[in-house]
């Protein structure tokens, strides 16, 4: 149950009732009450919730916002749940609640257990999250790694929030890059077999391609040497793509990312999907021919220039395939499509939304998360290249260096739109300075407390014992109340992080919860001689374990019981 949302609804109803009462009494002159926000103030002294409704309606009421706020506050029925309601600043209304609303949270967490934090906000709506979609011509780099952590955590959040989620990897296995890949493979293949051939100028210079061709020769010898060049390239690409994709899949699984669908760009060409998309665009009036090429009328939809879809040589552009791919996504019946792209694709977002509109779908159902760059630091200096390979640092190397959990946490710690400075030394440090260590240590400490309690013969109150009258009101220390409040926040936090596509909120929540638990443990002795207080605190400790575990699992991290 989302206790925070329930309280929001209760406060909202009280505000609406107060406004309607003031309007009926001719104290204020306002029309229909618009939707208004109820937020949690940053400063505790500003109460538990705050609203700006008076500021929203002041102009219509022809009153100063503070004056309108005071009219509202005067008519709010405080009942036995509202401790205080005050006007603050330019016209905010701050609400402070009695602690009683928090206590039902504790047994609810026990009852829900692994499902605590889940909600039905998504109502089963179908969502596709496409992320990473790295070129299968090389290894996964830091941008891919950040996208993997963000995308997978977002997918987990959406599932928790009640959406039907599909994770998809788009395989870029067609177009110019594959032609260059084929030429590169052929050159390395021939060179390894003793032929003196030049390497293509725009080829892929990675050592991994040499290793791929060396592996092929070890398995199959020079059987492709006698083939005509185009056929040889086709066979080499087929072998290399299979190997590269297997390697990418293994690396991502090692990183905790498992996809539901791997979608091939080449399949769009082979199935006629691109041609069908062009026909749809033509029927909708968004295609014209110029100098032998087919163009998309992007300017008719507000873009600065039109885009080529089919070159004069008859070969479709990448954009044509991308439009066909997005049409395919919506053809499959998704209610919401989310792409995670690198920030260098920012110019492509509006083009793609307009293309979605041009093929007959609602562009508002497509969201694109743009992800900023990652910089690795070691010893206070930027790490640009791998010492082992002389190339960019790969995700495999990062996992070896800092571990999956630290890598995933660090990548999700900042919003996608923020540049990320990844400190390798910090990620390995076993101290409170390292955020992932700090959070996981909190979970391990909780497990240690529960083991100690069990060894002393004390059990966490369960089911009937709680329902039969465990007095939770003894939990009245500020550190206890702050911890319970944070626990109560989780379902609301998950729902917001999912619907607003902000997986970094989970990292922040985990850190806040860990800090509040450490504070509680410092100020409140758990295994006290007072049975009633001890039982209540053991329940709070176990709830903290459940919540921290659920958040760590949502982020794709382990919840260690010992450290």
UniProtKB/Swiss-Prot annotation:
SUPFAM superfamilies: Anticodon-binding domain of a subclass of class I aminoacyl-tRNA synthetases, Arginyl-tRNA synthetase (ArgRS), N-terminal 'additional' domain, Nucleotidylyl transferase. PANTHER family: ARGININE--TRNA LIGASE, CYTOPLASMIC, ARGINYL-TRNA SYNTHETASE. It holds the Pfam family Arg_tRNA_synt_N. The keyword Nucleotide-binding applies. The keyword Heme does not apply. Monomer. It is found in: Cytoplasm. HAMAP family: Arg_tRNA_synth (MF_00123). It comes from the Bacteria. This is Arginine--tRNA ligase. NCBIfam families: argS. SMART domains: Arg_tRNA_synt_N, DALR_1. GO terms for molecular function: arginine-tRNA ligase activity; ATP binding. GO terms for biological process: arginyl-tRNA aminoacylation. It catalyses: tRNA(Arg) + L-arginine + ATP = L-arginyl-tRNA(Arg) + AMP + diphosphate. InterPro entries: aa-tRNA-synth_I_CS, Arg-tRNA-ligase, Arg-tRNA-synth_N, Arg-tRNA-synth_N_sf, ArgRS_core, DALR_anticod-bd, Rossmann-like_a/b/a_fold, tRNAsynth_Ia_anticodon-bd. A motif ('HIGH' region) lies at residues 134-144. It is an enzyme of class 6 (ligase). Transmembrane segments: none annotated.
